[in-house]
Amino acid sequence: MEDIKSLIAGVDEVGKGCLFGPVFAAAVILSKKNEIELLNQGLKDSKKLSQRQRHNLVPLIKTNSIAWTIGQASAREIDVMGIRDATEKAMLRALEKFSSPPDLILVDGILPIRLWPGKQKTQVRGESHFASIAAASVLAKETRDELIKRLARKYNCYGLEKNKGYGTEIHRTKLIKEGATKLHRKSFISRLKKN
């Protein structure tokens, strides 16, 4: 049994730049032993993995982590509070689901979570430096993509099953032709119309 002296959670988000749907965040706590196991199984930055590789890693991350959580902030929350605050809200929601707060959080990027009361460290391209952030990036991406796939059946004219809510040319063209749904980020779309 590994002696765990402190709980360190990696935190990452996905979907910040999308026109559709919530922003998701995940937080993952790994032991050193399980970090090595997951890295040996191919864990790395979710952007460097295929969809199949990410999908296969999800159960491994869930079973090999000490704890993992998911948080999200809706398109409406993004419109009301802005993407930075909504992203932080999603991260806080994930972190607050842990039964006890981690001793340290590792946040992907340069911006700390302003309302987090505990210790934190930011790291640009954190998913390339810390296995726990890489694991969080995979969980957040796969969880959000699964939701968008389900929503694509209901909102089938926007190409969501392929673009996952990002502002591809097809998505933008359909927005002009069909209009926005209640799950589109109105603040993002209004910026598109100005350009």
From Swiss-Prot:
InterPro entries xref list: RNase_HII (IPR022898), RNase_HII/HIII (IPR001352), RNase_HII/HIII_dom (IPR024567), RNaseH-like_sf (IPR012337), RNaseH_sf (IPR036397)
UniProt family annotation: Belongs to the RNase HII family.
Subcellular location field: Cytoplasm
Entry binding sites for a divalent metal cation: D12, E13, D108
Co-factor(s): Mn(2+); Mg(2+)
EC number(s) per entry: 3.1.26.4
Organism this protein belongs to: Prochlorococcus marinus (strain NATL2A)
Gene3D superfamilies: Ribonuclease H-like superfamily/Ribonuclease H
Function: Endonuclease that specifically degrades the RNA of RNA-DNA hybrids.
Enzyme class, spelled out: hydrolase
Membrane-crossing residue ranges in chain numbering: none
GO CC annotation terms, alphabetical: cytoplasm; ribonuclease H2 complex
Claim: Nuclease is one of the keywords in the record: yes
Keywords: Cytoplasm, Endonuclease, Hydrolase, Manganese, Metal-binding, Nuclease
Pfam families, alphabetized: RNase_HII
Single GO term (MF): manganese ion binding
Descriptive protein name: Ribonuclease HII
Residue stretches making up the RNase H type-2 domain: 6-195
Keyword Cytoplasm: yes
Principal localisation: cytoplasm
Biological process (GO), any one: mismatch repair
Reactions listed under catalytic activity: Endonucleolytic cleavage to 5'-phosphomonoester
Details of cofactor binding: Manganese or magnesium. Binds 1 divalent metal ion per monomer in the absence of substrate. May bind a second metal ion after substrate binding.
PANTHER family reported for this sequence: RIBONUCLEASE H2 SUBUNIT A, RIBONUCLEASE HII
